[in-house]
Amino acid sequence: MDTETSPLLSHNLSTREGIKQSTQGFLAHTIARHPGITAIILGILILLVIILIVVAIVYYNRSVDCKSTMPKLPPPGYYVQQPEPHHHFPVFFRKRKNSTTQQHIPSDEQLAELAHS
């Protein structure tokens, strides 16, 4: 579409160009009048971006490390030490005494009776 055939479009383009030129002019004018402040602000912005990138990398590495170390055994104090050494469940699994899975596991006395019979 030609800009001469549509006066609304040409007005819109000229307004955009005017805003763009005035913004560029304002920035150039500010940089020319205050070069020290502009350099300080740009330096701070660059440092913030670098810090943000470093924090993102460290956070990503930590989350990857946590996922890769999950299958390893936790420290020794994590599990509750009980007389039967073949049960290695964390504390929150031991709260319920009469669960359905515990009823199907025979005790040592029941196993001895079954072996003698």
Swiss-Prot record:
Keyword Nuclease: no
Topology class, membrane: Single-pass membrane protein
Membrane-spanning parts: 39-59
Location of the region described as Disordered in the Swiss-Prot/TrEMBL record: 97-117
Glycosylation sites per record: N12, N61, N98
Similarity annotation: Belongs to the asfivirus minor capsid protein p17 family.
Function: Together with the penton and the other minor capsid proteins (M1249L, p49), forms a complicated network immediately below the outer capsid shell, stabilizing the whole capsid. Three copies of p17 encircle each p72 capsomer in the inner capsid shell, anchoring p72 capsomers on the inner membrane. Required for the assembly of the capsid and icosahedral morphogenesis. Additionally, inhibits the host cGAS-STING pathway through its interaction with STING1 and subsequent interference of the recruitment of downstream components TBK1 and IKBKE.
Record's protein name: Minor capsid protein p17
Natural source organism: African swine fever virus (isolate Pig/Kenya/KEN-50/1950) (ASFV)
